[in-house]
Design a protein with these regions (language model features):
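A glycine/threonine-rich phosphate-anchoring loop and its flanking beta-alpha core
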Residues: 1-46
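Glycine- and other small-residue-rich loops at beta-strand/loop junctions that grip anionic moieties
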Residues: 23, 50, 176
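C-terminal charged capping/lid subdomain of soluble metabolic enzymes
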Residues: 140-199
Length: 199
């Protein structure tokens, strides 16, 4: 549902208000912004301005989220994470990763959105990398994350795995959220029926 009233006329983005946000919340919200950006980059409806904002978002989050996770009072990290989250909000051309997570969340009310995205991230992007379906965009994202001379989508996935490890999220499992293989079989139909998206 997108209506004008969903979008604020003015937003106050103040890093000082974020200093006491707990580490887990910091990582989940930060990675939600990261995936909004990464999905904008690989989206088939790509836009040059969206890509510019998204790649900068990815660069900032890769650099500053681990710092904010380890030291929530680090003002520089909070400042640049606030910038990254703001940039990610300008263009949210989501792909099926967000669609799948929304369906996961509809079955599990306690599943934090960012955590759900992290759970599916490696397999999701590996699906594209194995098929070389988004090589150029994924190479761009790897560069944004600081990878030197990336040559394939796999380089982005390795950088993503390293980022998740650095923020204590490498071991999040769907099974720990109560998600079963049988339940997952229901997801494709649910995605089409409720959200109208592909997978």
């Amino acid at each position: 549902i997108f209506v004008p009233s969903m979008f604020p006329t003015i937003s106050v983005v103040d890093p000082d208000l974020m200093m006491r946000v707990p580490p887990k919340c910091t990582t989940y919200q930060g990675m939600d912004a990261f995936f909004h950006a990464s999905e904008s980059v690989i989206n088939k409806n790509e836009h040059i301005v969206a890509e510019m904002f998204a790649l900068k978002t990815i660069e900032l989050i890769a650099k500053y989220l681990p710092v904010a996770y380890k030291d929530g009072s680090n003002k520089e990290a909070r400042y640049y994470m606030a910038i990254a989250n703001t940039l990610a909000g300008y263009y949210m051309n989501c792909t099926s990763a967000h669609t799948m997570e929304h369906v996961m969340g509809s079955y599990h009310e306690d599943l934090v959105h960012g955590a759900g995205l992290i759970m599916i991230a490696h397999a999701y992007y590996d699906f594209f990398a194995e098929r070389k379906a988004a090589e150029e965009p994924m190479i761009k994202m790897a560069k944004a994350m600081g990878v030197e001379n990336p040559t394939s989508g796999k380089d982005f996935i390795r950088a993503l795995d390293t980022l998740l490890e650095s923020i204590g999220c490498a071991d999040l499992k769907m099974s720990e959220a109560g998600i079963t293989r049988e339940e997952m079989k229901l997801y494709p139909k649910r995605i089409h029926e409720v959200l109208g998206g592909d997978i």
